[in-house]
């Protein structure tokens, strides 16, 4: 397994454990379509939480991966969410929130940084 894939999986698992402790239930993990991949999709009380996980070894100028979440990535992610909703119609009436989880590596006492992504205008796409 490539180093970046291991880091990504470790970061996703760390975020998933935390969210499960907070009552969220996993619906999809590493779901992909032609637009890209959704790292985590979770559900709780008629709410959907889509989490894009960025794991980095150092915070530095990159802020643990924040610079990788550019406008192009955001557009692809929103399109992927539309595809996911089209293939999971049961969740169409759920409210939707997209967050970016910035995970420091290696494991440390550093907390996760959560950034809520606003302005979601997503329609189910094919």
UniProtKB/Swiss-Prot annotation:
Query: What Pfam families does the annotation carry?
Result: UPF0102 (PF02021)
Please report any disulfide bonds recorded for this protein chain, giving both cysteine positions: none
GO MF, one example? nucleic acid binding
Q: State the family it belongs to.
A: Belongs to the UPF0102 family.
This one is known as UPF0102 protein P9303_16141
Which species is this record about? Answer: Prochlorococcus marinus (strain MIT 9303)
Q: What is the lineage of its organism?
A: Bacteria, Bacillati, Cyanobacteriota, Cyanophyceae, Synechococcales
